[in-house]
Amino acid sequence: MAPSTVAVEMLSPKEKNRLRKPVVEKMRRDRINSSIEQLKLLLEQEFARHQPNSKLEKADILEMAVSYLKHSKAFAAAAGPKSLHQDYSEGYSWCLQEAVQFLTLHAASDTQMKLLYHFQRPPAPAAPVKETPTPGAAPQPARSSTKAAASVSTSRQSACGLWRPW
């Protein structure tokens, strides 16, 4: 065994803690400095706009991060809460754009052309969506009989050549 290990093993717990404390403190400071550096990189554009050509201290970086978060939170609150219908529409539009982009990247086949034509048609008018009164609650599915749902599904399939799950 090395002499240093024997000496450490013979120390009391209080003495071990006294020796370990500077190492733990250095690790903590390194974590803090690393996080501040990451904040600086994330908010680099914000810093350039407010304080160009200045050396930023750690306190400046933290203050700027706090003000940026407050500003973005206030901006989100000013935009107002979105309804479930808006969220659904935005998600659907994004998904549709991704699908069209994917289809246009590859060589055009007959099926791809039909899909592109189908996606680019204007959507049929949708039934109004009822929102739940409590925020954060899951939307309740519409109650209908299976025969009515099946007849609507078959009429939609026969109306257009492509099957759609909606």
Curated annotation (Swiss-Prot):
Signal peptide: none
Biased composition (Low complexity): 142-156
Domain bHLH span(s) in chain numbering: 16-72
Tissue: Expressed predominantly in embryonic neural lineage cells.
Gene Ontology annotations of biological process type: astrocyte differentiation; BMP signaling pathway; brain development; camera-type eye development; cartilage development; cell adhesion; cell maturation; central nervous system myelination
Location, primary (coarse class): nucleus
InterPro entries assigned to the protein according to its UniProt record, in alphabetical order: bHLH_dom, HES_HEY, HLH_DNA-bd_sf, Orange_dom
Region (Disordered): 125-166
PROSITE patterns: BHLH, ORANGE
GO cellular component annotations of the record: nucleus
One Pfam family recorded for the sequence: Hairy_orange
UniProt GO molecular function: chromatin binding; DNA-binding transcription repressor activity, RNA polymerase II-specific; double-stranded DNA binding; protein dimerization activity; RNA polymerase II cis-regulatory region sequence-specific DNA binding; sequence-specific double-stranded DNA binding
Domain (Orange): residue spans on this chain: 88-119
Keywords per UniProt: Developmental protein, Differentiation, DNA-binding, Neurogenesis, Nucleus, Repressor, Transcription, Transcription regulation
Residue ranges of the motif WRPW motif: 163-166
Annotated compartments: Nucleus
TM regions (residue ranges): none
Domain-related comment: Has a particular type of basic domain (presence of a helix-interrupting proline) that binds to the N-box (CACNAG), rather than the canonical E-box (CANNTG).
Subunit comment: Transcription repression requires formation of a complex with a corepressor protein of the Groucho/TLE family.
Its biological purpose: Transcriptional repressor of genes that require a bHLH protein for their transcription. Plays an important role as neurogenesis negative regulator.
Protein name, as recorded: Transcription factor HES-5
Species of origin: Rattus norvegicus (Rat)
Lineage: Eukaryota, Metazoa, Chordata, Craniata, Vertebrata
Gene name per UniProt: Hes5
